[in-house]
Design a protein with these regions (language model features):
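NAD(P)-dependent short-chain dehydrogenase/reductase
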Residues: 130-134, 144-146, 152, 156-232, ...
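N-terminal Rossmann-like NAD(P)+-binding domain of SDR-like oxidoreductases, especially those catalyzing
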Residues: 1-177, 231, 300, 309-315, ...
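Conserved C-terminal active-site "lid" loop/helix of NAD(P)H-dependent oxidoreductases
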Residues: 220, 272-297, 315
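C-terminal "lid/loop" region of Rossmann-like NAD(P)-dependent oxidoreductases
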Residues: 206, 210, 237-239, 247-254, ...
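Residues in well-ordered alpha-helical elements
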Residues: 60-64, 73, 85, 92, ...
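Small-residue (primarily alanine) positions within well-ordered alpha-helices
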Residues: 79-80, 154, 226, 285, ...
Length: 322
């Protein structure tokens, strides 16, 4: 039975990846930081099937001990300080976890067993001020936030360990991916939660930043399958994972409010407080390599994704109201 370690298992991607690996017969070990309140809500339904251990990407010793104890076949590094606005408030912490944390994990693998396969969650935020449209594996990076900068470091240190120590280290450059498990601080979930509140009489308006902002949005449940496929190849490589389509925040609002028969124009207010200090440009992926090499393609459409998220928030808040 293969064993996989997932850092960031309590997050959106960690929970979907854990489900996928369990369905494939893996033993799943999740790593969570020691905190006074650990939120297990995304993996609550899995707690009897997985092992959750404490570990910290800022502590080299804890990572070596973790890898020695669990002897994994695969390690998926999904842990990060991943909310872009927070990376401006905590730039050094973002670097310590999101950048140096990758080095510490790779060092632990090199020290304990260099045959372990490693997946690094890279991000489309690395493209930032984009230098070509659409973005592919060879597109140069120009990150526009401390988070994006930290992810560029993590991406290149992964390639360095692959080339220098012959470690099977793959990097997935994932474009925005959402789900009903997305954190409420992210704009997509903020919208669907806001729509449900307005529909159920719990709210009157939704304040958002730049409605023109465009992203390539996909479903997180589809994207974790691409991660797994990367570690099943003969050779490690980098892959862009996205839908190849772009949509604006305004379009997201139209579909979300439309799902509950409301007109977004009556409820959405633009608030400049929510604008980013430096906005990224047109992020749109060219996922053709992932299609060719991994046989991967997204299954859930943009409209299905938005409606799935609205339905989930309606159900959650209706139950609370009852």
């Amino acid at each position: 039975m293969p064993t996989a370690i997932i850092t960031g298992i309590t997050g959106q991607d960690g929970s979907y990846l854990a489900e996928l690996l369990l369905s494939k017969g893996y033993k799943v070990v999740g790593v969570a930081r020691r905190a006074s309140t650990v939120t297990y809500e995304r993996i609550e339904h899995l707690l009897d099937k997985i092992t959750v251990v404490q570990g910290d990407l800022t502590d080299q010793g804890s990572l070596i001990a973790l890898i020695e104890e669990q002897q994994p076949t695969e390690v998926y590094n999904l842990a990060a300080q991943s909310f872009v606005p927070t990376s401006w408030n905590q730039p050094a912490l973002t670097g310590d976890v999101t950048a140096l944390g990758v080095t510490r994990l790779l060092e632990a693998i090199r020290y304990v067993n260099p045959k372990i396969r490693f997946y690094q969650a890279s991000s489309s935020e690395m493209f930032g001020k984009v230098l070509e449209v659409p973005q592919r594996e060879e597109t140069p990076f120009y990150p526009r936030s401390p988070y994006g900068v930290a992810k560029v470091y993590g991406h290149f240190i992964t390639i360095n360990y692959r080339e220098s120590f012959n470690i099977f280290a793959a990097s997935g450059i994932l474009f925005n991916h959402e789900s009903p498990r997305r954190g409420l601080e992210f704009v997509t979930r903020k919208i669907t939660d806001g729509v449900a509140k307005i529909k159920l009489g719990m709210g009157k308006e939704l304040r958002l930043g730049n409605l023109e902002s465009q992203r390539d949005w996909g479903f997180a449940g589809d994207y974790v399958d691409a991660m797994w496929r990367m570690l099943q190849q003969d050779e490690p490589d980098n892959f862009v994972v996205g839908t190849g389509e772009t949509h604006s925040v305004q379009e997201f609002c139209e579909i979300a409010f439309g799902r509950v028969d409301l007109d977004y124009k009556k409820y959405v207010t633009v608030d400049e407080r929510y604008y980013r200090p430096a906005e990224v440009d047109l992020l749109i992926s060219d996922p053709s390599k992932a299609g060719k090499v991994l046989g991967w393609e997204p299954k859930v459409t943009f409209k299905q994704l938005v409606e799935m998220m609205v339905d989930s928030d309606m159900k959650r808040l209706s139950a609370k109201a009852a």
